Regions:
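Conserved acidic donor-binding segment of nucleotide-sugar-dependent glycosyltransferases
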Residues: 262-272, 280-286
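Aromatic "clamp/platform" in nucleotide-sugar-dependent glycosyltransferases that forms part
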Residues: 230
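Extended catalytic core of nucleotide-activated donor transferases of GT-like folds
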Residues: 9-12, 24-113, 122
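Conserved catalytic-core segment of nucleotide-activated headgroup transferases in glycan assembly
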Residues: 126-129, 142-199, 209
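A short alpha->beta transition loop at the rim of the catalytic pocket in nucleotide-sugar-dependent
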Residues: 223, 245
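Short hydrophobic beta-strand element within catalytic cores of glycosyltransferases
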Residues: 247-250
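Short alpha-helical segment that forms part of, or immediately flanks, the ligand-binding pocket
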Residues: 216, 239-243, 254-258
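A charged, aromatic-enriched C-terminal amphipathic alpha-helix characteristic of glycosyltransferases
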Residues: 283-317, 321
């Protein structure tokens, strides 16, 4: 079927467009949030094709995967159709609730025509979804392969816009963690990170917006993956690191406690325990490799691509009946 969706979350979309459908990705002249089109740093198949708003009117979709309330407005404006009534629709909620948690009401809570698909059970539980039908389709990862070497006695962190997102993504924990072992931060929007948290450039390396494949290669050379995130949906970067075969040290918050089994690393709400675990893995390559193999096995079992695509096929089939 023809599936309309906006390029909102590149890593998630990379997995989604691996399916058997025709994926329509709006593109506008400015390639802004309403029309980013195809990815530039991920490899997407030809079935994920760019369409202008004008072309969409001629190439009508069978279903739309909404990811922002703005998408509802654009469907009405560009197609003259009402999502959930004239056009089958699913609202994909990427994010953990914000604001007055656990009383945060989902923007689509007061309707029943469009199901909300959460990406974690934690998110489904903590949102007030009201009368809206909900389901959970957990992440699926395009397996990058077991690339782990751990040859560098350093930790790796992947986070986008840590300066803007502040305590949400745990930037304030980096001084403590980098004292335990040198670490490298990969991601977008890293400018100002040194200044924001007083980080020592001799202990912390910054790698701003590398291509995904290159990032995976470099990340896998680090001894341990660190996930200092306090409050966000389950990061795809964490699952990718597990697929690479990296041991994990992270905060025991949101869905991480479900994703990382005990044998795959260390989760704790005590920053000092995380620093200790980083230090231990850096100084014990054999233990790090063993935990990394357990991490990869767990990720393949729970967050495999085939299961993810099958779950989405089932949901899209259900809403288009």
């Amino acid at each position: 079927m023809k599936v309309l969706l906006w390029h909102v979350h590149g890593s998630w979309t990379t997995s989604f467009v691996q399916g058997t459908h025709d994926y329509l990705l709006p593109v506008t002249p400015d390639r802004g949030p309403d029309g980013l089109g195809r990815a530039r740093t991920w490899e997407w198949p030809a079935s994920a094709r760019e369409v202008t708003p004008e072309q969409l009117r001629e190439d009508q979709p069978d279903v739309v995967v909404l990811q922002r309330t703005r998408d509802l407005e654009l469907v009405r404006e560009w197609l003259g159709r009402e999502p959930g009534r004239d056009l089958p629709a699913v609202f994909l909620e990427h994010n953990a609730p914000d604001g007055a948690v656990p009383n945060t009401r989902h923007p689509l809570a007061d309707q029943s025509a469009i199901p909300i698909a959460h990406v974690t059970f934690f998110n489904q539980l903590f949102y007030d979804n009201g009368s809206a039908p909900t389901t959970v389709i957990e992440h699926g990862i395009v397996d990058p392969g077991e690339r782990y070497t751990g040859e560098l006695a350093r930790a790796g962190v992947v986070v986008n816009e840590p300066v803007r997102r502040g305590r949400y993504t745990g930037g304030d924990l980096l001084p403590l963690l980098s004292a335990a072992a040198p670490l490298d931060v990969f991601g977008m929007g890293l400018t100002g990170l040194y200044e924001r948290y007083g980080l020592d450039p001799d202990r912390v390396g910054l790698h701003d917006d590398p291509p995904q494949a290159a990032m995976h290669d470099e990340l896998a050379r680090r001894r341990v993956y660190v996930h200092p995130v306090r409050w966000t949906s389950l990061g795809l970067s964490l699952l990718e690191a597990m697929h690479l075969g990296m041991p994990v040290v992270g905060l025991a918050t949101t869905e991480a406690v479900e994703a990382v089994p005990a044998e795959a690393g260390v989760l704790s709400t005590r920053p000092e325990r995380l620093a200790e675990a980083v230090r231990d893995f850096v100084h014990d390559p054999d233990a790090a490799r063993l935990a990394g193999k357990a991490a990869r096995a767990a990720a393949l079992e729970r967050y495999g691509l085939d299961r993810f695509l099958a779950d989405w096929d089932a949901l899209l089939t259900e809403v288009t009946r």
